[in-house]
């Protein structure tokens, strides 16, 4: 799904590349927009970038770049997508799905969501990126189930691949893609 020409359900052999799926089978990006990222593996999967388009889709290759096959779903994003908002969106979903049994997942995802919401609303603080990464490490290493262990993957992968977007939100109070409403300023 996402911002490509053809969306739908396809079946490809293990080892197919993201480039084959997005551009050959999916027809490329809508409206001539530039590919920015693809989120793979369901709500707790990682976000991959152009450098990963020729990566074979298999368990080991994806694990090396901080992603997973998971449900096999792909969400394709173009240049107009705010990656901080993407991380917030998936953390919101994961936090809602937490059963609450273990503290790292229940409280850690709640705290990560609070920080991400603060950032997209223009109230990010110095140290938020490091705090997100610290919480992600704690949650992934101490949670009891697969959801908790992978909950922070979208946040970690977007920080790794789009750190400058987080920094623009926090320090410049700007959303480079122009999507975060609280960070849009108007002049007359």
Per-range role (PLM):
Residues 1-188:
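Redox cofactor-anchoring modules in respiratory/redox and cofactor-processing assemblies
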